[in-house]
Amino acid sequence: MMMQQQITGTEHGWWIISNENRIWLPKGELPFGMATQWSLQGKIALPIGEWQGEKVWLIRQKMVSNMVSLRQIVASDRGLFQLAGRGVQLAEFYRSHQYCGYCGNEMHHSVSEWACLCHHCHERYYPQIAPCIIVGIRRDDHILLAQHQHHRGGVYTVLAGFVEVGETLEEAVVREVMEESNIKIRNLRYVASQPWPFPHSLMMAFLADYDSGEIRHDPQELISADWYHYDQLPLIPPHNTIARRLIEDTIVLCRNT
């Protein structure tokens, strides 16, 4: 059962306080401990999981200060970051689904799943999840890295993009790589996936080998793109990200070439 409840003050665990895709990080980290320690008694909370044997609670509220982007804890423990991402996405889902998009009546939270229900027209809404592909591309002992327009700060990463309607994951990889870098790839293989709450993506990761073409990056998407020798890389994404894993997996392949 996924029932909201009013906090009495005796509850203990991790506290995700979120509003408009931002999260409360007092002292720069997720609050942990008794509800009274964080003055949360009387708030309405929803249990959304467990971490290290402790409940994870979601409270949808804007705090006076220390409301920041979830990106601030990307490099923290992967499991905890994933739960925090779930909390932020659920908070935004419930905030944006207060009324039915079909009939305009008030929505109600399901107690058996993450969903909103309309008791008037019986419509049911679920959190939106956007499928994305991300791919590490190797050319001998080099890896293709790009600086994205939305990655200001000098970080270089692998290519990625959203899957379009009626498109397979494999087709999406081939299309995105061609659109963003003008090269063709081969030997495409699936690696892993990672929920990515910016804002509500599911990243599906692949590795591929270079086939043909010269890099010509799309200036609408990328600031630059180039081949980098595996032991002379620029600033890359932090640990616990699927992009970092693809880069590290490609480095291993380069060393074994």
Swiss-Prot record:
SUPFAM superfamilies: Nudix (SSF55811). A divalent metal cation 2 binds at residue 176. GO terms for biological process: NAD catabolic process; NADH metabolic process; NADP catabolic process. Zn(2+) binds at residues 100, 103, 118, 121. Divalent metal cations. Mg(2+) or Mn(2+). Substrate binds at residues 27, 71, 113, 126, 194-201, 243. One of its GO terms (cellular component) is cytosol. It holds the Pfam family NUDIX. A divalent metal cation 1 binds at residues 160, 180, 221. Keywords: Hydrolase, Magnesium, Manganese, Metal-binding, NAD, Zinc. Its cofactor is Mg(2+); Mn(2+); Zn(2+). It catalyses: a 5'-end NAD(+)-phospho-ribonucleoside in mRNA + H2O = a 5'-end phospho-adenosine-phospho-ribonucleoside in mRNA + beta-nicotinamide D-ribonucleotide + 2 H(+); NAD(+) + H2O = beta-nicotinamide D-ribonucleotide + AMP + 2 H(+); NADH + H2O = reduced beta-nicotinamide D-ribonucleotide + AMP + 2 H(+). It comes from the Bacteria. Belongs to the Nudix hydrolase family. NudC subfamily. mRNA decapping enzyme that specifically removes the nicotinamide adenine dinucleotide (NAD) cap from a subset of mRNAs by hydrolyzing the diphosphate linkage to produce nicotinamide mononucleotide (NMN) and 5' monophosphate mRNA. The NAD-cap is present at the 5'-end of some mRNAs and stabilizes RNA against 5'-processing. Has preference for mRNAs with a 5'-end purine. Catalyzes the hydrolysis of a broad range of dinucleotide pyrophosphates. This is NAD-capped RNA hydrolase NudC. The gene is nudC.
